Each structure stands twice: as structure tokens, then as C-alpha cells.
């Protein structure tokens, strides 16, 4: 029989489990502010703002220093490497700012998607080289969890068995390396919403992908209580002509998770996948109201679905700081309610609340 070497000690396991529970405590979710320099460039460009280090710092500071109303809503913040080492105007490093508000600091550790030879345009994710050393350093610098994104696409012949297996294995290797360094891995196998497939097809593919991911995590001796899953919601493809209700999306999503995700997993933090801000909140709420047994915390790890209205309200102008923070706070409060199944759509939406945030073939 296989034995895990080196095994995690009971102390290491407790630390990992405690961190995971803090991130997804009731009413809390994750702010994904880990856009790479290239991705944040597109966001800044959309508001006519130059992609300088100072503008990136100022914008992240705007989010991280929103007033204490967000404290009960945000359990963790995922940062990009650069942001982890930036400081607020008052001289405090951003990790300190996040911790002072009760949040856990996270770091994106993958190095982006690369083509997977032998497939029809499918990808794997790079960044395992030197990952252990980077994790050790990030832990010293205040990060307690990490994120790694793999991408799968639904097509007539995709995802292929090869792409599913390769991505599941790379996620498992990453997760194992994180845990050896005291960092909770967020496992993100994103199935893109591109395509004209219906809800059933997305559910089927999601089940196959998640089953492969948890088999790989078991093979690599990953301690599930010290992990979080960041999956897509089960939705029809963006080009699907058939409409499905929020309840149908919720039922398909929870069913897929119940069939594949062990109850030992601490929490599921959904990605928003280009849904509008309002849609992402409504679907999360429906998922939490779904009348099936759900043994994990079901919450959010949203990027654009927490930031779109705030970004628009800021518009690159310092004097719009407060207005932008109000928009961010509004979404944080909405999603905090949604992850408890208590959200009622207000209709008084933000600057971009109902705009689709879909970007085809989305690469961070």
C-alpha cells in the first residue's frame, strides 16, 4: 500500500484546516484581485486609464481599504505577486491591511496556460518549477493560501481524456506542494462558458472533470480538509439559445458537486465565469437555497463580479475613490447574503451590475 512521504503532521493538518475554515466562515467569501499585469491592463484600458504600477497599486488599495462593512463579507483576498509586495498610502504592506480586516492573504502561483501537445487547442497550466521555494517565501511574507487555475473547454471532442487527466494531475501536484509549505491550495479546474452546449452537457463534463480531480488529489495524498475547490457553476454555454432558470442552474450545480466532491472538502468558492455582478449573486443565492444536502460551505471567489461596478465608478480618478468603494461594498454585502441564501435582488444596481462580463477564451 502507498504511504504519503513526507506525511503532514497533525499540527500541519490542523493549521491547514483552520485556515480553510477561516476563509469560508459563514457569510464570507473571497475577493479575487489576482489579475496578472496583462489582465489588469484590459480592465484599466476599459476605463481609459494607463496600466502603470502606481495605478495598479491605487486600484488594489481602493478595494483593500474599503470600510469595515466588508469585514464580515471577505474571508480572503487573492493577490498577484506584485501586489503582495505593495504598500498602502499609510505605509502598511497590503497583507497587513488584509489581516487587519480579518481576512486571509492568498497568492496566485500558477504561471498561466500553455498549449497541450497532442490535443486540439487544449491547454495545461505551467508553474510547478520552483513552486515549493516560492510557497515557502510567500508563507514568510504573509500568504496562507494559494490559487492555481486550469482551463478546460467544452466542444464536440473536448475536453479530451488527456486534457482532463493532465490538468487533474497538475492541480494535485500543486496542491501537495502548497500543503507541504503550510499553504491551503485552492484547486481551480475552470470549464469555460464558451460554446453553445446546454445545461446537461455542462453538468456531465463538470462531473467528469471533478471526479478526475479528486482521484488525482487522492493519488497525491492531498489532505482534503485543508483545501478549497474553485469550480465553475453549471451553466449553459454563452451561445446556447435555450434559457434556464436560476433554480435549474443551482440544481445542476449542486447535483454535480454532490456526485463528485467529498464532504471532507472544507469549502467550494465559485468563480463567476463572466456572469454579470447581479447574475453571479442571484445564482449563488439559488445554489445555497437548493433543497439538497450540501456538506460544504458554498460561497464566492469573484473577480469581475465584485469589481466591475467599482472599476467603472472609479474611472481612474482619485476623487472617485469613495464612490468606487461604495460600489465594491454593495457587491460584497450582496454576495455575503447570497452565500447564506438570504439575498433579494434590489434592482438598485451598480454602474455595471447587469452587464455581461463574458470574455471569450478568457485567459488571466
Curated annotation (Swiss-Prot):
Record-listed beta-D-fructose 1,6-bisphosphate binding positions: 43, 272-274, 301, 304
GO CC terms: cytoplasm; cytosol; extracellular space; M band; membrane; myelin sheath; plasma membrane; protein-containing complex
Active-site residues annotated for this sequence: 188 (proton acceptor), 230 (schiff-base intermediate with dihydroxyacetone-p)
Claim: Ubl conjugation is one of the keywords in the record: yes
Similarity remark: Belongs to the class I fructose-bisphosphate aldolase family.
Free-text function comment from the UniProt entry: Catalyzes the reversible conversion of beta-D-fructose 1,6-bisphosphate (FBP) into two triose phosphate and plays a key role in glycolysis and gluconeogenesis. In addition, may also function as scaffolding protein.
Protein name as annotated: Fructose-bisphosphate aldolase A
Phylogenetic lineage: Eukaryota, Metazoa, Chordata, Craniata, Vertebrata
